[in-house]
Every structure is written in C-alpha cells, then in structure tokens.
Amino acid sequence: MLTDPIADMLTRIRNAHLALHKEVSVPRSKMKESLAAILKQEGYIEDVATEEGSIKLTLKYFKGKPVISGLKRVSKPGRRVYVGMHEIPKVQNGLGICILSTSRGVMDGNSAHESKVGGELLCEIW
C-alpha cells in the first residue's frame, strides 16, 4: 500500500522521462486527475486519457529532451506545508509552476494568487 500516491505519480513521470518513454500509466484518483489536467494545461505533458482504474499520460519532449526538467514533492504525509496567498513561491524564477490544493480545488500557483487563496503546497515542477 502506498503512503504517498502523489509522490508515486511524480516518480513515475520522472522515471518515464529518464527512460525516454512516450507514455506512463498511474493509478487513478481525483487528485491525480486534477494534477494531470494542470500539467496538460501548462504544457508539460501532451495528453491525459482516463481509463478504468488508471490514467495514461502522454509525455512531451522537445528536440529529444523531456520538457519537464525537475519535479519536487513539497508537502509530504509526514510534514505538511501550507502557504498563504502572499507566500506562494516562484519556481525557478517563474520558469516553473507550483501546484496547490486549495479550498477551491487543485490549482497552479498563478491561479491561486489570482483567486486570492492559499493552501497546501503539493509540488513544484520546472
């Protein structure tokens, strides 16, 4: 049994990119679907397909190199990290995104700042 399914998803994406795989499959949950939708919206992955019990992510490459250079899980089950609206970090000086779980759902840092909400800082992607 997994203790941190979000970290597992990020690790699967990282490993698939390092192995230059075209697709990766992760077990399905609402939180992971929201994360995948944000990654697609921000241009880090090409496509998201939900199948019964799993989510299939089509990874994106530019000139043979992965579009995602790094993934970092911030808030972990043993140490939760919460940020207010004014404390949302800029990832890699604005070249990356952070993803938050807010009272209005899962959203990236820019959307959370525009909506004037803070929340749990799930991960950073650059």
From Swiss-Prot:
GO process annotations (BP): translation
InterPro entries xref list: Ribosomal_uS8, Ribosomal_uS8_CS, Ribosomal_uS8_sf
Top-level taxon of origin: Bacteria
Pfam families the UniProt entry points to: Ribosomal_S8
One annotated Gene Ontology cellular component of this protein: ribonucleoprotein complex
Assigned keywords, A-Z: Ribonucleoprotein, Ribosomal protein, RNA-binding, rRNA-binding
Keyword RNA-binding listed: yes
GO molecular function: rRNA binding; structural constituent of ribosome
Record's subunit section: Part of the 30S ribosomal subunit. Contacts proteins S5 and S12.
Family: Belongs to the universal ribosomal protein uS8 family.
Function: One of the primary rRNA binding proteins, it binds directly to 16S rRNA central domain where it helps coordinate assembly of the platform of the 30S subunit.
Name this polypeptide is given: Small ribosomal subunit protein uS8
